[in-house]
From Swiss-Prot:
Function noted in UniProt: Inhibitor of fungal polygalacturonase. It is an important factor for plant resistance to phytopathogenic fungi.
Organism of this sequence: Arabidopsis thaliana (Mouse-ear cress)
Family: Belongs to the polygalacturonase-inhibiting protein family.
Signal peptide: 1-21
A molecular function GO annotation: polygalacturonase inhibitor activity
Chain positions of LRR repeats: 69-93, 94-117, 118-141, 142-166, 167-192, 194-215, 217-237, 238-260, 261-285, 287-308
Listed InterPro entries: Leu-rich_rpt (IPR001611), LRR_dom_sf (IPR032675), LRR_N_plant-typ (IPR013210), PGIP (IPR051848)
Subcellular location, principal: secreted
Carbohydrate attachment residues: 106, 120, 130, 291
One Gene Ontology cellular component: plant-type cell wall
Disulfide-linked positions: 25-55, 56-63, 298-320, 322-329
Keywords: Cell wall, Disulfide bond, Glycoprotein, Leucine-rich repeat, Membrane, Repeat, Secreted, Signal
The protein's name in its UniProt record: Polygalacturonase inhibitor 2
Amino acid sequence: MDKTMTLFLLLSTLLLTTSLAKDLCHKDDKTTLLKIKKSLNNPYHLASWDPKTDCCSWYCLECGDATVNHRVTSLIIQDGEISGQIPPEVGDLPYLTSLIFRKLTNLTGHIQPTIAKLKNLTFLRLSWTNLTGPVPEFLSQLKNLEYIDLSFNDLSGSIPSSLSSLRKLEYLELSRNKLTGPIPESFGTFSGKVPSLFLSHNQLSGTIPKSLGNPDFYRIDLSRNKLQGDASILFGAKKTTWIVDISRNMFQFDLSKVKLAKTLNNLDMNHNGITGSIPAEWSKAYFQLLNVSYNRLCGRIPKGEYIQRFDSYSFFHNKCLCGAPLPSCK
């Protein structure tokens, strides 16, 4: 009798555990995910999304723990043969903290406005697709955003100044689009943290705002635009900047007066209209990358352990720079 009872209890526990395991997925999330799959034309990439199975076991997503009732917290669709537009149903996954559509060259249309409903979102990556239209203003409504990557798309129009109001933002990547207009003045007064800022390979124009000299950017890349003005405001001895890339613009300033942060590791300012000479203090800088070519610099290249690592490519096509690795000064 005891053995029978023990066996009964074990079987009951097993059945209960199996039942609970099957029911981890919230029914509303499963319904929404199946609508997303249908909206994307039922791609093979989402073959695991079988309505007969627990959605928390499906590929391309993650569920949270019991504290959020195992709701879907991450949707990660990338590297697949998927066509269409971002399904509006993504906005019906209220517990999402991470949303990624990446390396989907047949994904088209505008950035889905229903994303504005995702108030818990901290990580947004919509990159390497064929998305068009503007960088949406509604992103500034998502107050928990820490990471935004909209690079390698066909986005156009101006950069919304309201993005600077995101107090938790640490990373803003808008490179490789068709964005136009100036850098917003408000980017000199981010409400919270100062994010790493990547705006390269666009069609941005106008004078760089003076306010951009106020933040202590850890990484800033403004390369390959049509920007003008005095970019020396980005530098400063008291800053903690690591990477600055302002190459292939139309910046004009006197390099002789520029003081570098001791932390600066990568500096690229090739193809501008920069004048003056390379400061002697640069001989002590710890550069891993340096390029000042195609400017209007003159004078002797300072001698130093790290600056001497670079070949002529980093210095050539200037007005009258001289000294190793270029020809000797006369």
